[in-house]
Amino acid sequence: MCDQQPIQCCVPIPQCCVKGSSFGPSQFSYANNQVLVEAPCEMKVLECAAPCPVQVSQTACQSSTTEVKGQAPCKTTKGKCQAPCQSKTTQVKYQPKTTEIKCQAPCQTQVSCVQCQAPCQSQVSYVQIPQPPQTYYVECPPVYYTETRYVEYPVSTYMPAPALQPGYTYVECPAVGQGQGQGQGGFSTQYQYQGSYGSCTPQSQSRRSYSSCGPQNQSQASYSYCEPQFQSGPSYTNCGPQRQSQASYGNCTSQLQSRASYSNCSSQRRSGATFSTCAPRCQSQGTYGSYTSQRRSQSTSRCLPPRRLQPSYRSCSPPRHSEPCYSSCLPSRCSSGSYNYCTPPRRSEPIYGSHCPPRGRPSGCSQRCGPKCRVEISSPCCPRQVPPQRCPVQIPPFRGRSQSCPRQPSWGVSCPDLRPRADPHPFPRSCRPQHLDRSPESSRQRCPVPAPRPYPRPQPCPSPEPRPYPRPQPCPSPEPRPRPCPQPCPSPEPRPCPPLRRFSEPCLYPEPCSAPQPVPHPAPRPVPRPRPVHCENPGPRPQPCPLPHPEPMPRPAPCSSPEPCGQPVRCPSPCSGPNPVPYRQELGCHESNPCRLDTEGPRCGSYNFTQRQESNGSCESGDVFSGSHGLSGCGDQGNTCGGMNCGAYGGAKGAYF
């Protein structure tokens, strides 16, 4: 009808009129007041600037009817067009799954004239498009509200059961509700959103209530002899299902649980619980009483859901957390020579055994009575795990610094002398670590010479004289370099940590002479410089001055020395020993600084050395620590093993790492 209409196309009709099949909604895109007609297939797309600005009224955007009231340029898309262009109404109905726009546009001749200067000032097109893949609403985002309402019809199975009280018989009552129900055993279920059963006829109310299977008329049902099983798939013995969020029961009163089933009343097939006395005793899950719930994920004999307690550790290795306390896993004191691999969790706070002996090592066993710096080895003397008292010692998190003995002020600060100092007082029970200098050097340089040692401790850098007893393996290492020995440790004054040694390098500088340590210390961890033998000499290993003659000492793994730990024994310097021999990564007794366990790697060798028995509080021979993590000399650790055998701590890491 284009030719019959006085339509002035903005362009010549050959170009302006588009022939083609009807357009789906996706062919129109509206941008910048331009109607972009995407012609399907071979059709030509015309862009006409709409002279009439399209004013969109977002009227029905929300109800899946997009009403575009606009002075839209009269774009006429091919369709059955019976209307002239000036007052056409394009109604596109969103038929589900139909993406065809039925335009009552003029031009049955398959010519759609696009009136660019269209007179269609007040043209309203109602587009109801059936979920087109792309629908362009002018300034109105397509809002397809598909409201699907699902009416839940619970699948209720009624199990015919004898009436709980005589005189109540359930007749087959026709369902009186919107829904239809399935009934078994002569019960009719009314599947309604709400319903109540009078005499088995639903009373269509917001909640079902049963008196004696009669309605109790309440929003929450109470049942005299009926029990509601309010759950999605309930099975009711006596009464029809009462599906509500809460119920109170006359005889069989469920205690208002979301999951309850009642034994006398009816077993409800649920994952919840059944109750013998009709009172649910366990909210969560369980079976109760004599009736077993039809479908139950858990059943408990006594109506009590299993109470989840903290797991008890069978394998004695408590979970790692900051402060575990182990009741039975650990022997209360070290005396029991071994414990079941009780590896305490690694923690940064030191833990102190409550049995910490007064200053001075306990005799006979290496009790870790000092702060256990961060790591307890699972050693035969399982330290008694008492809730660690917070000691000022702060242990930095474990950082594998196997190679270096960098001076870390933090260590000095955070790690008190773990070893008993020369002072006679061992750590008090309070387990306060003895105050030690905050600098790693200071802590490191406890060089009190242990008197009791049969062999003189090499306080000065002079090579330590051979001790009467062979030191544990001298950790033979490459010849000690002629490093100037640090000044002898004449006194227990803390000495700065010697520079990090590489394994390759002998430990030329003496390790800080620490007071004789009762505990052999694992050989120096593999530091870039090999340390002279860190044979755990109970004697202070004041100067790791590498002896010129690196004679490999026999490795008496225990490295135990008779000396008491009373003095803050510095971990024996690698050079110290009857014949300190520098060695690279040689296995030997390594002493670890407990304070540095986290950061240290094996100093000298990977031997696990057995703590030496010290007369005063010797480490038990069973204490085996992995030397790999042991620190070599306390000297470079910056901490003396004050109050504790270094051996006890040395290599403690092995247990955890």
UniProtKB/Swiss-Prot annotation:
Residues 449-493, 517-530, 539-561 have a biased composition (Pro residues). One of its GO terms (biological process) is establishment of skin barrier. Residues 292-302 have a biased composition (Low complexity). The gene is Kprp. Residues 434-444 have a biased composition (Basic and acidic residues). The keyword Mitochondrion does not apply. The keyword Transferase does not apply. It is found in: Cytoplasm. The modification Phosphoserine is found at S442. GO terms for cellular component: cytoplasm. Keywords: Cytoplasm, Phosphoprotein. This is Keratinocyte proline-rich protein. Residues 285-320, 425-493, 517-568 are annotated as: Disordered. InterPro entries: Keratinocyte_PR (IPR052881).
